[in-house]
Each structure stands twice: as C-alpha cells, then as structure tokens.
Amino acid sequence: MLYPTPIAKLIDSFSKLPGIGAKTATRLAFYTISMSDEDVNDFAKNLLAAKRELTYCSVCGRLTDDDPCIICTDETRDRTKILVVEDSKDVSAMEKIQEYRGLYHVLQGLISPMNGVGPDDINLKSLITRLMDSEVDEVIIATNATADGEATSMYISRVLKPAGIKVTRLARGLAVGSDIEYADEVTLLRAIENRTEL
C-alpha cells in the first residue's frame, strides 16, 4: 500500500525495532499520528533523553544513568559472585526475583561465529580485568539457552578455569532457545538455585 511520505518514513523507523514487523510498524505509525501533540512531544522528548542520558556502567557494562551504577556501588551486595548476562534487560529480570544479591557483568552481546561476532566484539575483556583484582570466587553464566549463548558460555568457562575461578551455569529450567528476560520469576529462581558447574 502506498502511504504519504511522512507515514512511510515513520513506518520504516518503527520497523527497524527488533520484533516489529510491517503490520505492527504500520499500526504504531498510525497510532502515533493520532496522539495529541503533547503526547507525541513527550514521547520524542523521553526517547531523546534516554538516548542522551544513559551510559554503560564502567564497571559492569549495564545501562545506567549513574556511573558506576547503583548495583556496583551497593556495599551490601555479595562481591564474591558475578552473574554474567547478555544485556541490561537480563539484569532487570534477575533483580525481579530478589534472590540473587551478587554483582553482574553485562556482555552487551554474545559470541556468534555464524554472524562473525568473536570474543573481542563483546564486553568480555573487562570481565577478565575485573576478576584479576577482585575477591570473586564464582562466575555464574546466565546467557540465553541458544547456540550463541552456549558458545559464549563455553568460551568464558574455558578462559576462566585456569585462573581457579568456579564457573557455573544457570540450571536448565529455561527451555532451549528461550530468553531470560521472558522467563517467569519461579523459573529464574529455580535456575539460579540449581546452577551447575561447568
């Protein structure tokens, strides 16, 4: 269908978002133009503010508006454990269960040989540097149960084992191919309680 140029551009912009197909992008575009000017301005202002004000924590790599982030500066956290996740959404999912009280490390991606993403392309070097001068005795790998998540998990385990650091993986309450951010709280709780050593 042929749309006026401004709508077509808006549809194109929405369709660049992950998980948004042509139909959803079209619905979002038409909904957006039906919003009041005030609501559209607020939406645009909030989008720009998030883009400008957020940064990655210099310690853990999590998206934050403070650097270092509130988790890294919390002295009540267990500093002997680091839970490694793919992205900041996974930190939020784990924090929701209120069971894990250690630190985090956000990789900002996964090793993906099929897509040409190697260990140097994700936030992995800073994890190794972080471990060298710390009291961490366990690294818990909480990558998604996908081929890339498994490849990343095995690589991290292989790199850290010689250093004598215990490396564990979340238990398999998570279905293969599932994303941590979509898992329910009970599944995440069981996965962390029953983690296995790699």
Curated annotation (Swiss-Prot):
Domain Toprim, chain residue ranges per copy: 80-175
Keywords: DNA damage, DNA recombination, DNA repair, Metal-binding, Zinc, Zinc-finger
Top-rank taxon, per record: Bacteria
One Gene Ontology term from the biological process aspect of the record: DNA recombination
Zn finger residue spans: C4-type: 57-72
Pfam families: RecR_C (PF21175), RecR_HhH (PF21176), Toprim_4 (PF13662)
InterPro entries according to UniProt: DNA_Rcmb_RecR, Rcmb_RecR, Rcmb_RecR_Znf, TOPRIM_dom, TOPRIM_RecR
Gene3D superfamilies reported in the protein's UniProt record: 3.30.60.80, 3.40.1360.10, 6.10.250.240, RecR Domain 1
Signal peptide: none
GO molecular function: DNA binding; zinc ion binding
Function: May play a role in DNA repair. It seems to be involved in an RecBC-independent recombinational process of DNA repair. It may act with RecF and RecO.
Family per similarity comment: Belongs to the RecR family.
Record-given protein name: Recombination protein RecR
Organism field: Streptococcus thermophilus (strain ATCC BAA-250 / LMG 18311)
